Amino acid sequence: MTTALTSHSNQLPDMPGINVLLMGPAGTGKTHSIGTAVDAGVELFGNSSLEVFYLGLEPGLESLKGYWTDAGKPIPPNIHWHSIKAPDIGFADMIDAAKMINTLSLDSLAKMQDAKRSKHNQFIAILEALANFPDDRTGEKFGAVNTWGSDRMLVIDGMAGLNRASLAMVVGGKPVKSQSDWGIAQDQVEKILRKICEDCKCHFILLGHVERETDQILGGVKIMISTLGKALAPKIPAMFSDVILTVRQGTKWTWDTSNSQADLKTRNLPIAADNPPDFAPVLKKWLARARAE
């Protein structure tokens, strides 16, 4: 069953939602903070509420659920989730691949094609989920993401899973990747992000890890989103309204929008190193601007 857009979508301003890239090292609270968006969706959007759809490409659902369960609270009804399954690759397949690596020359490995590449279909599963989002929680389907309004939010967790799925779609389990393989995979990741950021009106949050990359324009090294190769990372921030660095110092978690060593930007938060890890101010600022005449 596909659930149509609810009637309350017309009560919200007809303005595209926020596009937020939340990036940082592991353990800095990226997935956990999605709970603040769910809660803010109830507090700020009133009776209409903001429905949040979490697409898990990496292990993270446990952390998201823990935002409520660890505090002894029920999981709100406005959060939906779907987890993409890992490729159906067994240890026997890994043994076969290891034997080829152990016996074939580098040139032979580079020329080989993975006969089991069709098993690496995660990227296709991601697109299918975006074409008609299936809720693992209720069994309902909620239609294509590009038909949603600003009463809905898509969360993709995270960029590393998207990277792996795209590259595996191109090469399968082939151990040696050519420059063309990397280029095709990068192009697919860029296309899916541009489609969501530029052609969808729903709110969008992308979670990702970071790495240090050379700034090809200004020189030097900057903290950027971890993605395929070096050419794609500098293109990604321009697609988003906010690019935020997640930070943990001891037992304190913050969002940094001012770090000059990172490729950051913000439209909906103060430029500061110690913003609280909370989506409520971001959504509140968006609502104020969207309702302005």
Model regions: which residues?
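Conserved P-loop
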Residues: 10-138, 143, 147-150, 161
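Short His-Asn-centered micro-motif
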Residues: 23-25, 54-58, 156, 207-209, ...
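C-terminal regions of RecA-like/P-loop NTPase motor modules
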Residues: 1-7, 14-18, 253-293
